[in-house]
Amino acid sequence: MKLLVAVDFSGPTDLILRVARRLAKSLDASVWVVHAAEPDPDFVGYDTGPEVVRGQVAKELREEHRSLQRYTDQLREAGVDAKAILVRGSTVEALLAMAEKQGADLIVVGSHGRGMVAEMILGSISQGLIRAGRWPVTVVPVKNQKE
């Protein structure tokens, strides 16, 4: 069995990983820890050139990849087969593409609340994954966790 665990490096990420670890151990599953990084900007600001933007984006991607590696190291130390994947793009679409590519059996995601107005306009990651209807989705409630 394969679990795809979506993380965004916010405060509740540790809780989401703890739940994923318990699930992986009880199901004898491997874990793919996935973060969907921001897609390329549509335009470059007037004050910064493309090289500056590319350099900053590259630095952020390296930092995000290091964080993913730390998470997978922690899971491996707990006896879970874990790998890290950093993708770029719209979060829901990127996660669905990775679930397909990796042959995921279950997606684990946090229930980050953005507030009612933002959620009405933008929707939520968990809702988007559930609406896709192709994989079971475990939503970890994180409302009372510190961000």
Regions found by a protein language model. Name each.
Residues 9, 106-128, 146-147:
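Glycine-rich, Arg-bearing micro-motifs that act as flexible, cationic patches
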Residues 32, 83, 138:
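Conserved beta-strand positions in the Rossmann-like core of class I SAM-dependent methyltransferases
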Residues 35, 110-112, 142:
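Short secondary-structure boundary segments
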Residues 48-52, 101-103, 125-126:
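Short, hinge-like loop/turn segments at secondary-structure boundaries
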Residues 73-107, 144-147:
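Structural beta-alpha unit
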